[in-house]
Amino acid sequence: MSGHSKWHNIQAKKGKNDAAKGRIFTKIGRELILAARDGGSNPDTNAKLRDVIAKAKAANMPNDTIDRAIKKGAGELEGITYEEIVYEGYAPGGVAVMVKCLTDNRNRSAASVRHKFDKYGGNLGANGCVSYMFQRKGQLVIEKTDEIDEDELMMQALEAGAEDFSAEEEVFEITTDPEDFSAVREELEKNGYTFLEADVTMIPDVMAAVDMETAPKTQKLLDMLEEDDDVQDVYHNAEYPEEFEG
């Protein structure tokens, strides 16, 4: 899959869209609140919070914004209580879609997600209808540069506990067990690497090839889901034609 990796298909457009809409701080803020609520406000003893803080800093989120979100999650500041809900369904072309929401209103989120699936040619299904097609994995993506030695990076990643390493056209992709994600990320950071993407995500086992006629319809639904205020992440297995720009 060189040059046409799962990360390229699944993550590149998502990251671009979030950045263009200026929504990423809001999404990371919710993750910080949830991580601090579930595991406490001390990143030394809360690996999930440590990971989200690293993600926030990589996105250039201001320190005071990070601190406020953590305090809200820990109950030190008044804030909204969020719960995580995952919806599953299909986009045009038989593309499997998982929609992760962090919401303070379950009914609002359910109605909004269902409306978007109905309006843009998808089908919202029952829990479990597509999740079996995905695996929860840690994913680290590093941009290829002349300064990075591929063999050295691979050895460092595998020795740190990574499950898999692949070299694509423009990036290196490192996959970990979710439990090992923090350790691998921190070890590579100590060795001077920076990441285009570093997160625990849902990686599809099989991609669904989408033709040029269907691709705009598929992407439209995915875009509209990502624009929803309650939606945190959209995972899918669409594999677009090389010439499709999105």
Curated annotation (Swiss-Prot):
**What subcellular locations does the record give?**
Cytoplasm
Q: Print the keywords alphabetically.
A: Cytoplasm, DNA-binding, Transcription, Transcription regulation
Superkingdom field: Bacteria
- Name the Gene Ontology molecular function terms of this record: DNA binding
Q: Biological process GO annotation list?
A: regulation of DNA-templated transcription
What InterPro entries does the database record attribute to this sequence?
Integrase-like_N, TACO1_YebC-like_2nd/3rd_dom, TACO1_YebC_N, Transcrip_reg_TACO1-like, Transcrip_reg_TACO1-like_dom3, YebC-like
Transmembrane annotation, as ranges? none
Q: What is its main location?
A: cytoplasm
Record has Metal-binding as a keyword:
no
Kindly state one GO CC term assigned in the UniProt record: cytosol
- Does Ion transport count among this protein's keywords? no
- Supply the PANTHER family for this chain: TRANSCRIPTIONAL REGULATORY PROTEIN YEBC-RELATED, TRANSLATIONAL ACTIVATOR OF CYTOCHROME C OXIDASE 1
**Family per UniProt?**
Belongs to the TACO1 family.
| Stated name of the protein | Probable transcriptional regulatory protein NT01CX_1819
Q: Which organism is it from?
A: Clostridium novyi (strain NT)
